Amino acid sequence: MKQYLELMQKVLDEGTQKNDRTGTGTLSIFGHQMRFNLQDGFPLVTTKRCHLRSIIHELLWFLQGDTNIAYLHENNVTIWDEWADENGDLGPVYGKQWRAWPTPDGRHIDQITTVLNQLKNDPDSRRIIVSAWNVGELDKMALAPCHAFFQFYVADGKLSCQLYQRSCDVFLGLPFNIASYALLVHMMAQQCDLEVGDFVWTGGDTHLYSNHMDQTHLQLSREPRPLPKLIIKRKPESIFDYRFEDFEIEGYDPHPGIKAPVAI
């Protein structure tokens, strides 16, 4: 995961001081890309421990189309707590847009099912895309989508994915985002009888919060360790039938975790 550490250093070296919605302040760069060959290992940051339970359960929650944090709480995941209302609702965030994008005539489009069908029946299509950025519903969302748009690509029997992330919290959020989409690529590839290819991450406003600087320097002082391997223990009937127990990360030997405040 040297690419990730190099991005951190780039933000420190080249970033512009900017104000932000949270009032915390950031160092920010605009436009950055990283490529991870998923054949080389699972891209889970090793210079600090990442909470894999949260990453897996959040992705399963998205795939169910859920937008209430009750499922997350049942599984001891609290990463969405700060944005939920008193009933645990977040509005039409990722899960709603992925699974039930509303159309003007009252229908709902299941984008995940659509891209699975495309991958199986028209893998050379240049339209194998999922978007969470629904302009008509942004004002109803507790938090506008940060990882907003992703595209799948099939070549030589391998499935690749590129994500566009409009806003990226490099220290806290990005390790989650990379691992989450890498996991999704593995799941989609298994469902489509493909091998995994590359995960390409593209960032817009890519920033370090001003209250994450000490943590960033600590992480940069650490040497990356070998990437772990993802094992999927079974192939469910559909992309929506995976369970937490289906996934195992083998050989994950990270440095200790580093705590940092969340900018809300």
UniProtKB/Swiss-Prot annotation:
Which amino acids does the record list as binding (6R)-5,10-methylene-5,6,7,8-tetrahydrofolate? Answer: H51, D169, A263
Top enzyme class, one word, equals transferase
Similarity comment: family membership:
Belongs to the thymidylate synthase family. Bacterial-type ThyA subfamily.
Catalytic activity line of the entry: dUMP + (6R)-5,10-methylene-5,6,7,8-tetrahydrofolate = 7,8-dihydrofolate + dTMP
Compartment(s) of residence = Cytoplasm
List the GO biological process terms: dTMP biosynthetic process; dTTP biosynthetic process; methylation; regulation of translation; response to radiation
Q: Which superkingdom heads the taxonomic lineage of this protein's source?
A: Bacteria
Q: What does the UniProt record tell us about how this protein is modified after translation? A: Although not discussed in the published references, Met-1 is represented in the submitted PDB entries as being modified by either a formyl, or a carboxyl group. The N-terminal is probably N-(dihydroxymethyl)methionine, the hydrated form of N-formylmethionine.
So what does this one do? Catalyzes the reductive methylation of 2'-deoxyuridine-5'-monophosphate (dUMP) to 2'-deoxythymidine-5'-monophosphate (dTMP) while utilizing 5,10-methylenetetrahydrofolate (mTHF) as the methyl donor and reductant in the reaction, yielding dihydrofolate (DHF) as a by-product. This enzymatic reaction provides an intracellular de novo source of dTMP, an essential precursor for DNA biosynthesis. This protein also binds to its mRNA thus repressing its own translation.
Q: Name one Pfam family in it.
A: Thymidylat_synt
Its keywords, alphabetically, are:
Cytoplasm, Formylation, Methyltransferase, Nucleotide biosynthesis, Repressor, RNA-binding, Transferase, Translation regulation
UniProt-listed Gene3D superfamilies: Thymidylate synthase/dCMP hydroxymethylase domain
- This protein is called Thymidylate synthase
EC number(s) given by UniProt: 2.1.1.45
Query: How is the subunit organization of this protein annotated in UniProt?
Result: Homodimer.
- What's the effect of swapping R126E? Shows 2000-fold decrease in catalytic activity and 600-fold decrease in affinity for dUMP
Name the NCBIfam families on file.
PRK01827.1-3, PRK01827.1-5, thym_sym
Recorded GO CC terms: cytosol
Q: Where is the active site?
A: C146 (nucleophile)
> Pathway it belongs to?
Pyrimidine metabolism; dTTP biosynthesis
**Which residues does the record give as dUMP binding sites?**
R21, R126, R127, R166, S167, C168, D169, N177, H207, L208, Y209
One MF term in the entry's GO annotations? RNA binding
